[in-house]
């Protein structure tokens, strides 16, 4: 789909320096895997996102959105059409007890701003390696807290390029799910309503959560974060551990020996390695316990062409 007409049209909508052609996506994912994007766009304004989305819709060009690539696997075949990186939409503003943050802002950074202003409610996010857009998309959470507990609204763009402002209720936030996924929307910014707190207490809670995370999670290797959703009444990591799968490797990717809920890239692993290992773990746990493990990590892009 790389053609001159699309490139020239994009140049009319967004500055040329924000457009990359045939761009390797492994540079932008935590797994360090992924093929190329036909067109990789890095808008810095909401209006630029709207313009590109509207053009793509009118011309039936597929659009894919990327945040900081922390909970996603991109196949080696790459992504056709237009990939829009939202990382440059990274503003963070504080107004009384509320924080408004752009889609590309790291939720860790937003939690630290909350700390700076002695606002409580985002401590749970101090170790989540995702962007605001991704966090709202999947209702990210950790250690008993989640986005739906403190979000006020999200400003989104629909498939036609129109702006939509959704309240907490309208976002339909559920366990690792939201209306954003169901309606193929993209988050441009989100507002969080917090509460005044004591800085020392907020800091202490964040320090505790950070220590717990660092002691339990395999942060020394590239990974896609938590691979599976929590099955009702169970923990995915415990099921995988009890299936004796820790350390099991396919290609360069293995089930972490530190935390069975993670898969790490230990030796130049590929997206195909990740996908094959995920399927193997799902099959093994299903056979042993009769429990389906549903993915939390997103897998997108085309399979590599067979040589």
Curated annotation (Swiss-Prot):
What GO terms describe the biological role, i.e. biological process, of this protein?
A: cell division; cell wall organization; peptidoglycan biosynthetic process; regulation of cell shape
Q: What is its EC number?
A: 1.3.1.98
Annotated catalysed reactions: UDP-N-acetyl-alpha-D-muramate + NADP(+) = UDP-N-acetyl-3-O-(1-carboxyvinyl)-alpha-D-glucosamine + NADPH + H(+)
Molecular functions (GO terms): FAD binding; UDP-N-acetylmuramate dehydrogenase activity
Every copy of the FAD-binding PCMH-type domain together lies at 33-197
The protein's job, in short, is: Cell wall formation.
Entries under HAMAP family matching the protein: MurB
Protein name, UniProt field = UDP-N-acetylenolpyruvoylglucosamine reductase
